[in-house]
A protein has these predicted regions:
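Extracellular glycan-modifying ectodomains
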Residues: 2-6, 10-377
Length: 377
């Protein structure tokens, strides 16, 4: 105890000092007899009060050590997070972009889809069918993938799909076209969809393949948003969201001599003089700027008189491409099979369809079976 240690000191002290110490001891004894809850003992003038028994003296040390451990653990997780290159099927590239892993094809689905297309051709021999699949960015830009990435050869998968199509169905190739323009911004860095520029290339390829005229004159570029953040941003490395760009440019290209048109929502029957929803461009779901979101069925009627009615069966990849068809077809019917059970055969009869375009992102076409329901007869 502190008292015992002090009493054992052999160094002589003056009488006055000794008396003062005795008086302090007496005062302490009196206070202790009245209230025995005191936890402090008095030593010499130079020694400060200390917690009794030392039970509280080290209480701050464990908290300090805990803070150090938490900081070290957080830094370790952050380092692991930063070094991660693959997350939820998405590769993070050195330039900050996100590339989706090519999916394994559903062989049965692909075979059944090709068979249904052939059956449709036999039922409607004058109906022209086309398939255009947009390859993933990883397929076109493999050099941007991390060195450790091992992905499927999607070019080979697409070639296999093409080889299994019936002769009555025409394939529209985008792999070579996009490879020739791989140095241009064809894809969003934070989403699987094509940019306005990439959509322009795809639309022109489809229009030419379907024997229609591309609008004359220049295309006008419109910036709808400069803070677009796609679905891949949700899977990017969280610790880097604070340090990297918060968005991309969302642009559309419109021909200067674009034909006049109006669209009708197949369910609500509401019509509009625009294919775009300007309010959506500034929302968290900016890609809904096209048609106001994913619609089951949309009718587009134009002033282009050529007796051609195009039926587009597709996924959301088609949303940014279809608007560029308005100057090349008199009527366009755009259907998302995931939103409606309507069949191609019924649509062909109802709208007197002359051409059918199956327009999908390659990954979606590889695995999405809703198309099979639409192709049923």
């Amino acid at each position: 105890m502190a008292f015992e240690k002090h009493a054992a000191q052999e160094e002589p002290v003056s009488a006055g000092a000794w008396e003062k110490k005795q008086k302090r001891r007496t005062d302490m004894d009196k206070a202790d007899s009245v209230k025995r809850t005191s936890t402090y003992a008095v030593t010499d003038d130079a020694e400060k009060s200390k917690p009794a028994g030392g039970t509280r003296a080290g209480s701050g040390l464990p908290i300090f050590l805990l803070c150090i451990l938490m900081i070290a653990s957080g830094m370790g997780l952050m380092y692991k997070d930063i070094s991660r290159t693959f997350r939820h099927g998405i590769y993070r590239c050195e330039y900050g972009g996100m590339l989706e892993e090519p999916r394994e094809p559903d062989d049965e689905k692909i075979t059944m889809a090709a068979g249904s297309m052939e059956a449709l051709s036999q039922t409607y021999p004058n109906l022209q069918q086309y398939v255009m699949l947009v390859p993933t960015a990883a397929c076109i830009l493999p050099d941007y993938l991390p060195e450790s990435a091992e992905i499927r050869d999607q070019k080979a998968d697409l070639a296999n799909i093409q080889s299994r199509l019936p002769e009555s169905v025409q394939w529209i190739d985008l792999v070579q076209l996009f490879s020739d323009h791989s140095g241009e911004k064809l894809y969003y860095a934070s989403d699987r969809y094509l940019t306005g520029w990439g959509s322009r290339y795809a639309a022109r390829a489809a229009i030419e393949a379907m024997g229609q005229k591309i609008p004359e004159g220049k295309d006008q570029c419109y910036l709808l948003s400069n803070s677009f953040s796609g679905r891949f941003a949700m899977d990017r490395i969280p610790s880097l969201n604070y340090f990297e760009s918060s968005g991309e440019r969302l642009e559309i290209y419109v021909p200067e001599n674009e034909a006049c048109y109006y669209r009708v929502d197949g369910r609500s029957k509401k019509w509009s003089g625009s294919l775009y929803d300007a309010d959506a461009a500034q929302s968290t779901a900016a890609y809904n700027v096209f048609f106001g979101g994913e619609k089951a069925l949309t009718e587009i009627h134009t002033t282009r008189i050529n007796a051609e009615t195009l039926l587009v069966i597709g996924d959301r990849t088609a949303d940014s491409i279809v608007p560029l068809f308005v100057s090349s077809f008199e009527n366009i019917v755009f259907v998302h099979p995931s939103k409606t059970p309507v069949t191609v055969e019924k649509l062909v009869k109802k709208y007197n369809v002359t051409k059918v375009l199956y327009l999908y992102g390659a990954n979606e076409y590889m695995t999405d079976r809703t198309l099979l329901r639409t192709l049923q007869q």
